[in-house]
Amino acid sequence: MEQNNIKEQLISFFNQACSTHQERLDFICSTRESDTFSSVDVPLEPIKNIIEITKDENQQIEITKIAVNNIKTLSSVGATGQYMASFFSTNSEPAIIFCVIYFLYHFGFLKDNNKKQIIKKAYETIADNIADYLNEN
């Protein structure tokens, strides 16, 4: 599957699950703390579709490329949770790819350990910054 098609599918499913800015942030913060979605009030069917896409080893190379590009984008908008949180409100693509990063490393779908560690570190740093910002406000 072509990179843009994967990205479009992921964005579509994520927007079905988390249609508002607050739902996105809640989802990101809750996935950071748990491997279940019981504390997230979003439709689970689109999330299951995202998981199925990320589980497909043939698509993981493209997904990883997209994820790395989005990590670079997130890094460029600033290190504070406030900037990242506001960035997600106007950019659904980084928000969904950010959550896909979570699925890739947390559920062990990604086999390349170097990429897994880079993605894990980036995810945790960004999620921690956003959670800290939300807890302060």
Swiss-Prot record:
Residues annotated as signal peptide: none
One Pfam family named in its UniProt record: DUF1951
InterPro entries per record: DUF1951 (IPR015271), MG354-like_sf (IPR035947)
Name of the featured protein: Uncharacterized protein MG354
Organism the protein comes from: Mycoplasma genitalium (strain ATCC 33530 / DSM 19775 / NCTC 10195 / G37)
